[in-house]
Each structure stands twice: as C-alpha cells, then as structure tokens.
Swiss-Prot record:
SMART domains: PYNP_C (SM00941). The enzymes which catalyze the reversible phosphorolysis of pyrimidine nucleosides are involved in the degradation of these compounds and in their utilization as carbon and energy sources, or in the rescue of pyrimidine bases for nucleotide synthesis. Pathway: Pyrimidine metabolism; dTMP biosynthesis via salvage pathway; dTMP from thymine: step 1/2. Its EC number is 2.4.2.4. The gene is deoA. This is Thymidine phosphorylase. Homodimer. PANTHER family: THYMIDINE PHOSPHORYLASE (PTHR10515:SF0). GO terms for biological process: pyrimidine nucleobase metabolic process; thymidine metabolic process. Belongs to the thymidine/pyrimidine-nucleoside phosphorylase family.
C-alpha cells in the first residue's frame, strides 16, 4: 500500500519512483482517489526533477492500461497494425493520405486522432468538414471499417486512456505541459492503447512546431523512440520541418481537398510528398511490409498511381457515414467561404522566412480553429496557395489566398499573413523536409 503524498515527496526530492508506485498513482488518477492538488504536485515535481527512461515507460504503460486497450486478434487481420502520430503543425494533412496509403500496402491503421490545439490544425476537424463522416463511431463500427477498408481515422473514445484525460487537463491549468517525460507518456499512452505493432512518430521542428527549439524537438523524439520501444511497440521518430506551411494550404475543408488531390494525382505538393513518403515508408518497414525504405517507396508510389489509396480513402469515408462518391465529387460536398481573395507582398524579393505559428493563428482568427475548447468551427475558411520559402515574390503576385466569411475577418488575416511571411533580398538556404530519423538503434 502506497501513499500519494509519499510518492510526491520522493519525486520532489529527485528520487526514482518504482513501477509499482507509478501504477498506484495512475490508478488513483483514474478512480479519483488521488486529488487534483496531488496530481498537480506530482506534475510539478516531474517538471523540475524529470523521470528516467524506466519511470517514463512505467508511466506510459500504466496510463495506457488505465482504460481499454484495443485488441485486434479476434478480427484475424492478415497484416500488421501500424500508425503515425504528429506533434502537430500548420497545413499538416499527412494522416489523410498516409492512412489509406499504408492500408493499400497491406497494413491496418486504426488511427485515433485529436482536434486542433492552439495554432495547430486537428485531423478530426478536417474530417468533420465532410458531411456525414462520424468521428465518434461505436467500437463495432470502428473495428468493421478497420477490417474492411484497412484504415479508420476517428476520435478518442471515452474508455481509452482516462488517466491521460484527467492528468492533461490539470497539467494544462498548472503550467506543467512542457515536461518531456509527461508529453511522452501523454502521446504514447493514447497511441499504444490502439494495440499497435509499429508506430512512426513525426516530431516537428521550426516556427510552427510545438517544441520551441531543434534541441527540444530532438530530445522529445529520442524520448518517444526509447519509451515506445521499451513498451513493446516498434517505433521510429522523424524530425521534420515546420518552418513553413507543410501543404499548400491551411484550413479544414481546404486541406481535405488537397489530400484528395494528392491521392488522385491531381496535385502533389513536393514538400508534403517527401514527409508523407518518409513516414509511410518507415511504417511499412517497421511493420514488415517492406524490407527497406526504397522497396517501401516503390509500393507507396504504386498505390498512389494506380488509384488504390484514393479508393481506400473513399471506402473509409463512406464506411463512417460520408458520401459514397466523395473522392470523385468532393467539391460538391465541401463548403466554400464567402470571400476568396489574394494577399500581395509590399515589395519584391524572396520569401525568406515564415512565422508558421502566426499563419496557423490567422486560420484560428478566421474561424477555422478554436480559441477555447468547444468552440464551433467554420470549415470553409483558411489560407490556400501559400508561397514556399525561396519563391521569388513581386507585388503583382499573390503570396497566399485568404478564404474568409467577412471583410473584417479578411482584413485581419491579410495583416497577419503579410507580417508572417518575410520578404528578403536574397534567396534563403533550402532546409531539408526531413532532418533525421531516430531509430531504436540510434539511442
């Protein structure tokens, strides 16, 4: 029998907690025998004194096991259960293509996603732009769509990881969100509760990233790779660039359009293509569906070019209640804003830097993101045809198009976009889309 206050005292004194102590505390978070004040105190103690890898693995697995852990064995699936998670960015529409692409190559992708947070867009918000699509199906429908389509992208259900829900809301209110140990456990407990065989982790770097510096992003990537593999799920983290909008657009319906165009081959943004392929290829290799990255890329290009990935996306959409002809006729179903107008730079030069976070906040201001949880969204608004770093710019050429519902919203977004996209005299050095891979063997 343990006492919550003794566990807090140990961590306050920078001692190591045992697996049993961590399990006891997490059980208390779940069944409310540990108070909000005690949870906040442990969060602050961990924030200042950190946890070693064994403690992080114990916290992650205890939180994973605080609710239902999905088990796919009864479905007799003939492929690995694989997934991807991103720390979030702007124009990060990868999940919409990656899930169907991986499924088309023989994987099964039960992707449990989230809504938008701060300046970053949420995968579920993009799907909510599709009429009829149910992001909260019951367990039977979720399993049915995973089995039949190979992929289902839905929201976190009430019985998955209840400990994280309570712990996260308290961390959010007590300034302990930024602990690498606690971020690792929060992300991985949710992902590993989906019963995964393998996971590719996309950790963003740059002005639109969740972590403030490259070093902090790398530290998080190393922690996630170590803890996930330690918890028994093959995992690789990729450090990817978020110093500019990843797709050509940002905004819910706009990103869905770009994702469908990507899968049908109508348009593939080269940066988006590189990061999507890097993550998806790693999933195939970790899941045993390809022996190396080049073989994985050949398979992925094949399912893009022969239409199989697009077909699977359509099957997932209709399986979860959306229109059966969505891929063919998406423009019929997705909303358009009242105003669609270009923004121009005030001078000639090169797009030399981008404050990606500010561009994400411009989408929030337009109504495409939340200022507080529970806010209703306007799925039609956002930015499209956003210029890329290194593009030559002149005052007659748009740096982006703004999709707004009112003149005042347009004017506010226009000022934000002009401020966020810096025009310089010289072309900036090209940054890689993927900075590095962190595999278990690199730790």
């Amino acid at each position: 029998m343990f006492l919550a206050q003794e566990i807090i005292r140990k961590k306050r004194n920078a001692e190591t907690l045992s697996t049993e102590e961590i399990q006891f505390f997490v059980k208390g978070i779940t069944n409310n025998t540990v108070s909000e004040g005690q949870i906040a105190a442990l969060g602050m103690a961990v924030y200042f004194n950190d946890m070693n890898m064994d403690e992080r693995i114990a916290l992650t697995t205890a939180m994973r096991d605080s609710g239902t852990v999905l088990n796919w064995q009864s479905l007799d699936l003939n492929g690995p259960i694989i997934d991807k998670h991103s720390t979030g960015g702007v124009g990060d529409v990868i999940s919409l293509m990656l899930g169907p692409m991986a499924a088309a190559c023989g994987g099964y992708v039960p992707m449990i996603s989230g809504r938008g947070l701060g300046h970053t867009g949420g995968t579920l918000d993009k799907f909510d732009a599709i009429p009829g699509y149910n992001t909260e199906p019951d367990s039977a429908l979720f399993r049915k769509v995973v089995k039949e389509a190979g992929v289902a992208i839905i929201g976190q259900t009430g019985d998955l990881v209840p400990a994280d829900k309570r712990f996260y809301s308290i961390r959010d209110n007590t300034a302990t969100v930024e602990s690498i140990s606690l971020i690792t456990a929060s992300i991985l407990s949710k992902k590993l509760a989906a019963g995964l065989d393998a996971l590719a982790m996309d950790v963003k770097v740059g002005t639109g990233a969740f972590m403030p510096t490259y070093e902090a992003s790398e530290e998080l990537a190393r922690s996630i790779t170590a803890v996930a593999n330690g918890a028994g799920t093959k995992t690789t983290a990729l450090l990817t660039d978020m110093n500019q909008v990843l797709a050509s657009c940002a905004g819910n319906a706009l990103e869905v359009k770009e994702a469908v165009d990507f899968m049908t081959g109508a348009y593939r943004n080269p940066r988006l293509y590189e990061v999507t392929m890097g993550l998806c290829a790693e999933m195939l290799v970790l899941g045993g569906l390809a022996s190396n990255e080049s073989e994985a890329r050949v398979k992925l290009n094949t399912v893009l070019d022969n239409g199989k990935a697009a077909e699977i996306f359509g099957r997932m959409v209709s399986g979860l209640g959306g229109p059966a002809d969505f891929v063919e006729n998406y423009s019929k179903y997705l909303p358009d804003s009242q105003i669609i107008r270009p923004v121009y730079a005030d001078r000639s030069g090169f797009a030399s830097a981008m404050d990606t976070r500010e561009l994400g906040l411009a989408v929030v201001t337009l109504g495409g993101g939340r200022r507080k949880p529970g806010d209703a969204l306007d799925y039609s608004v956002g930015l499209s045809k956003v210029c890329a770093l290194g593009d030559e710019i002149n005052p007659e050429q748009p740096i982006a198009f703004i999709h707004a519902q009112s003149e005042s919203a347009f004017a506010e977004a226009e000022a934000a976009v002009k401020k966020a996209i810096h025009i310089g005299d010289s072309k900036p050095e090209k940054t890689p889309e993927i900075y590095r891979y962190i595999r278990e063997s690199d730790l």
